[in-house]
Amino acid sequence: MHIASDPRRPIMVILATVSAFAISMAAAAQHRLITQGNDRLAIVDAGGDIEWEMPWRGIHDIHVLPDGHIMVQRGASEVVEIDPETKQVVWSYDSRLQNGNAGKAVEVHAFQPLPPKSAVNPTDDWRLMIAESGTARIIEVDRSGAMLATTPMTVDKPHPHMDTRLVRKIAKDRYLVCHEGDGAVREYVQGTGQVIWDYDVPMKVGEGPDEARDGHGPEAFGNKCFGAIRLPDGDTLIATGNGHSVIKVDPAKKIVWSVTRNELPNIRLAWVTTLELLPNGNYVIGNCHAGPGQPLLVELEPKAKKVVWTFDQFDRFGNSVPNSQILDTPGAIR
């Protein structure tokens, strides 16, 4: 028996394929997150809608506390805690004014809450770590503003705006510091400031010019590293800033993994800023100054370098979104 062919069949197959792809993408993890851009600080739900927001100027670091309060920078040197229900600042510390810094040029680009009795703070006291650029020191303060610890940093090209970018305490007596101006990542011993590991970020990883270029977007080029995290296997993941790449470096300083500017399909990495290691092993990469049509965040399965999620809200947050925090993945390393 002859069965007549259906002229609609090719179209139906295409539609089925597209639908399957759409369902697959919809099934992929969507994330609730907090970020800042276009003078707005906002929590975005997993569906991409604004859940909460308030006016706020630019930041370089952000942390949401267990009680939901938000810690961000205000201006160049102050760290504040915001109650999201009232949208009021309930605590602050200004590095330009406190603990011996009055009259000095100081900027703060990184800070980190240190919960009591944790791997990074074995004491009974809640602490806040603050990296002070200009005075080149890392301090830990309590709620009263009293300084409980201080650690000097080594800076080859001192400048209050470029001494540091993100800094993280990675053990009870260790700090991992991104030095933007020096183009280096250094690990310090708390108190003494001894450098026990360091890595000079290469000017070129993969494609790119052979010398630095000014700017902030895809046209810029250099080794102004922004973020670094220590991975559980002992390697260090580094966001190279205007190097347009992420590199994984082993303790012997060998690059063992990387993703470069145009390596991901339809994605252009610009000023690469933040890094998060999710519990499933995926990396979330901050992609700042990339321009319209490019994601602000990229979640990547590193082994296959497969993009599993992107956050693209350029129209809402603009071209300068330096930091964010994924809020629905407890246990992430950032």
What do the PLM-derived regions correspond to, one by one?
Residues 1-12:
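N-terminal secretory signal peptides that target proteins for export/translocation
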Residues 6-8, 18-19, 28:
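Intrinsic disorder/low-complexity segments
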Residues 12-24:
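Bacterial N-terminal signal peptides
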Residues 29-334:
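Histidine-/acidic-rich catalytic cores in large beta-rich domains
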